[in-house]
Every structure is written in C-alpha cells, then in structure tokens.
Amino acid sequence: MSKESKITLIGSKLAKTGGEFIYLGEIEECKNCKFKRLCHGNLEVGRKYKIVSVRSANHPCIVHEGGVKVVEVVLADLTIMIESKKALEGVVLNHEPITCDNFDCEYYSFCNSEGIKEGEKYKIKQVLNEKINCPFGNSLKKVIVELVENK
C-alpha cells in the first residue's frame, strides 16, 4: 500500500506530529456528528496510522475532551516478528502470524501484531539486530515492515 496521506480528525491531546494510533472505528456518540465523515470516512478499522502534520484549528467534540484537530496521516510502518530464515531486507512476503498464546511473553505483541492481517503482503524495510529468546524455542527476528498492495 502506498504512503498516500489521508485527512482525518483526532483528539487535540493526541494530535502530535509523529504520533501513531490504531483506528478502532466509529462509536455510538459519533452517529449524529457533523464531522463524522471526516473523522471516520478515510480510515480503515484495524490499521495503524502515523500523524505527519497537524493543523492549528480546534473543533468541538463530545468524545474528546478539548476537542479535535485536523491531521494528515499515512499508514505507519509496523514492527513484527517473523521466522529468522525469512528475515531479509527488501523481501516481500505474505503475513503469517506467529502462533502463540503466551500473553505474558515480552514479544507477544510483535508475534500477534495489530495493523496487519494474515495473508497481506509486506516489504521488510529493516531487520532489527535484537536477540529474541522465544520461550517456545522458535527462531525469530523482529523486523520493520511496510504494507504493499496486493496485485
């Protein structure tokens, strides 16, 4: 997927350039809001976005204390865990989540990453040189990836 930017609204207290968030979708309080389309119309549920610019105007919002600001966002890069043998910079792969139910593991959130779905294509931008001690003995590497369009 390209790094094309989208315009949306986010709580003023969260509106900081470089900030990242996962869009969780519309809530009941948004149903009759005049800004509903701008807040929710451009984003995909479950995706992680990075704020690249913040506009100064503040708008009222019944959900966000302090109102909301207009922000420009792009899809954020993701840090995920993959099998070591597949961890090569520049490679494009289909996402295969690491099967793990050890919620207490320090790596759990990387093996079960939010923002990417099983089967989606991604490109490895960087292999992180970090020693991973998987409690189940899996040979894993932490990588930074960007989503790519399925063609």
Curated annotation (Swiss-Prot):
PANTHER family: UPF0179 PROTEIN MJ1627. It comes from the Archaea. This is UPF0179 protein MJ1627. Belongs to the UPF0179 family. It comes from Methanocaldococcus jannaschii (strain ATCC 43067 / DSM 2661 / JAL-1 / JCM 10045 / NBRC 100440). Pfam families: UPF0179.
